[in-house]
Amino acid sequence: MKRLFAWGAPLFALVALTLSLFSQADTKPSTIDSTSANYQQATLAGGCFWCTESDMEKLPGVVDVISGYAGGDVDNPTYKQVSSGKTGHIEVIQVTFDPKIVTYEQVLDNFFRHIDPTDDQGSFVDRGEQYRPAIFYHNAEQLEVAKRFMMEIDQLGIFKKPLKTELIEFKKFWPAEDYHQDYYKKNKVRYNYYRYASGRDQYLDEIFGADRNTHPKTLRQWIDEKNGQANVKAYVRPSDEQIRAKLTSLQYKVTQRDGTERPFDNEYWDNKEEGIYVDIVSGEPLFSSTDKYDSKTGWPSFTQPLNSSYIVTKDDNSLFYTRTEVRSRFADSHLGHVFNDGPAPTGLRYCMNSAAMRFIPKQEMAAQGYGEYLALFK
């Protein structure tokens, strides 16, 4: 599996051996009860389980990730047996997650964004069916979610090739040897060397962009954005005179002069009513109460927009560091900023100004022309 390039092996082995003496002492057994009835499991194959384990453990809502083997004919297989390709097993990770925090689709979303799901002959530098991508579904619901989501990803076309990720009924999981568990923590140098040499990150950068870690975007966001572009309505920006007459001094300062209102002293920071938020100038739909959460900042915060086609982001260098500004597409109103410290499923915090938005309660949405969004509240 982890075949390192010969030219770097001697020096690398010396460094890795030295560091491993120190890193192994840091390994601690998990104190989390991953068998709780409140949790669910996903069993996924995406090539080297050193890498897939590392990537999946970073997803909020994931309780535990164990590297192992599934799908074969031999009980309690060893790594040597599985890597030979003769047992029928595939290298997998078994993911225990809290469905109150992260859904099964969101687990799959994270999984697909860290593998090559189009290669059924292996995974990056590791060749053979024991490294092919697969989803071992635990029940009929997982199967349906996976089939539907994969169809949407194929239609999106982001991978440029058809998905060849196999759907296999889950039967049995065997944990891999202890030294494979949390390998990226215990053997950082060797892991980083292997990961770079495998070509995994280079491939993912090509598909999702070199900023995929600093500005993550889920496949669901890509899909919704593509679908949303087909359903975008044109909104009109009023004249400057009309805007001045319509807005309060604070609303004008925020939207037209890129101002910021005071935290905890604005209209919507603690609004818990169901409904949507639209641009105060043009009325274009921006955010939903279904994506609103308490960020403890004193400003209304959301994990994602209603339709990303209605917002525009740009670099803001007005302070001593670069922020990402959020503006409305048609009115070009300054709305606020987006940060990478939000909760699941997006990991984003759209920190908005109440003064830039108008709230429409759910019961008034149809009458005001926003009935298409009522399905969000069913």
Swiss-Prot record:
This enzyme's EC code(s): 1.8.4.11, 1.8.4.12
InterPro entries, per the entry: Met_Sox_Rdtase_MsrA_dom, Met_Sox_Rdtase_MsrA_sf, Met_Sox_Rdtase_MsrB, Met_Sox_Rdtase_MsrB_dom, Mss4-like_sf
Active-site residue numbers: 48, 351
Catalytic activity: L-methionyl-[protein] + [thioredoxin]-disulfide + H2O = L-methionyl-(S)-S-oxide-[protein] + [thioredoxin]-dithiol; [thioredoxin]-disulfide + L-methionine + H2O = L-methionine (S)-S-oxide + [thioredoxin]-dithiol; L-methionyl-[protein] + [thioredoxin]-disulfide + H2O = L-methionyl-(R)-S-oxide-[protein] + [thioredoxin]-dithiol
GO function term, MF aspect, one: L-methionine:thioredoxin-disulfide S-oxidoreductase activity
Gene Ontology CC: cytoplasm
GO BP term (any one): response to oxidative stress
Cited SUPFAM superfamilies: Mss4-like, Peptide methionine sulfoxide reductase
Primary role: Has an important function as a repair enzyme for proteins that have been inactivated by oxidation. Catalyzes the reversible oxidation-reduction of methionine sulfoxide in proteins to methionine.
Family: In the N-terminal section; belongs to the MsrA Met sulfoxide reductase family.
Protein known as: Peptide methionine sulfoxide reductase MsrA/MsrB
